[in-house]
């Protein structure tokens, strides 16, 4: 019996064996990502794909200043509203910035035909040449070119008129028929603007044009229209009962435009030879101009970012990330960040069998921790770590490139559709944005899932690599660890890590230690059986004595009557 108790004590007080564990890196990162199956997974490393910051300013784009219209609208600028004279010196720009409620537009009330289409055309123009298409003094010798002014277009307290148009009126009591043509020799598209006056009464018609019935005809190879003034009393706008309707056309190089009229023509004075540039545009913004330079401009402010997506604003000019409605697009590049809990011990489930990562391993993603008589320490597996880094880096770069290529192509297609259809329905725009957002989010979710699975697989592969080397020279003790059946010094540990472990060298020692441990287990089982019997008998005796004592006490105080019948 004494021998058996001695064996039990030996089993309970066995010394710590040499161990090696497979694990992964952990740190103090609080980055979280979403996957297809999980939300807010904490990871060691990740990259943000969504830009949500701007500077709140209007900036130059690649060193080129925008054309800031200030209090003028596109209409006021291009027609030549007298209050917009300061803009006439601007010959080129990176984009056009217009305020939401511009004061100076069409100073004389009337309808601007195809105004939205004109804005669309000007949005792709980065510079123009403003030139006299019909010089004021020499083009209209039989008509008055100075009396056509109005208080509605006053400038510095005096009646005036548009700086790019001429209001032709009677001269010396007559308004002769006119015919004027222009041949576009600019080798560029030329924007030509004109107007047709609609008086409020016949008296004004006779006074200004000396006839009751008049017409205006404008003809080119792509434009053919005849206008008849509509004389009618109208509500006053800017103290005017009359109206001027404004028209425009684009004249191709070599094409000719012909104006014929016998009254009511608001003639072109200046025209514009257009130079189109990729990346120009028109934005409506209250942001102020600043001395800054950027690659991307939105109505909210400038963005300086190389990220593929942004949620600042759907309207962008320049080299901009694609707009999506997402609030978070973060792609994982590292591992699940689950630092090991001290109460569980050092090792401890990224791959399903390891409970936590190691903050002590800082030079790699996957690696080892060993413990022997010479001490303990961490060592990263550089090969598997570097292969993983290369693979994930290439994948992230490829995905970003695919995202940019995909959405840029879609963006170009929509721009073409906008010109053909003139206006995209807002619901259609919203639908496309939803598709872009869904595609971006789904792609990130799928790739995050794949990356985390990839890390799991790498840890498992490292574990299987060690297991296949050690075979039965060590036993699996859980949490990614192995306990050696033999002494394993630092040289031995290094051989396991680099894949050169000599299994036969340690087989005999392992076999002997394994047999000893198995013997101890068998002896221990016998001892445990004896202890179990003793424990059962002792417990029964204690129970019987307790019951007897209680019965005696109850009989003595009359709570329990005992009768013996013979």
UniProtKB/Swiss-Prot annotation:
Post-translational modification: Palmitoylated.
Top-level taxon in the UniProt lineage: Viruses
Residues with lipid group (S-palmitoyl cysteine): 555, 562, 565
Paired cysteines (S-S): 21-481, 59-292, 72-84, 107-153, 296-320, 488-492
Gene: HA
Keywords, alphabetical: Clathrin- and caveolin-independent endocytosis of virus by host, Clathrin-mediated endocytosis of virus by host, Disulfide bond, Fusion of virus membrane with host endosomal membrane, Fusion of virus membrane with host membrane, Glycoprotein, Hemagglutinin, Host cell membrane, Host membrane, Host-virus interaction, Lipoprotein, Membrane, Palmitate, Signal, Transmembrane, Transmembrane helix, Viral attachment to host cell, Viral envelope protein, Viral penetration into host cytoplasm, Virion, Virus endocytosis by host, Virus entry into host cell
Protein's job: Binds to sialic acid-containing receptors on the cell surface, bringing about the attachment of the virus particle to the cell. This attachment induces virion internalization either through clathrin-dependent endocytosis or through clathrin- and caveolin-independent pathway. Plays a major role in the determination of host range restriction and virulence. Class I viral fusion protein. Responsible for penetration of the virus into the cell cytoplasm by mediating the fusion of the membrane of the endocytosed virus particle with the endosomal membrane.
Membership in a protein family: Belongs to the influenza viruses hemagglutinin family.
A GO CC term assigned to this protein in UniProt: viral envelope
Membrane topology (UniProt): Single-pass type I membrane protein
Description of how the protein assembles with itself and partners: Homotrimer of disulfide-linked HA1-HA2. Interacts with human CACNA1C.
Entry protein name: Hemagglutinin
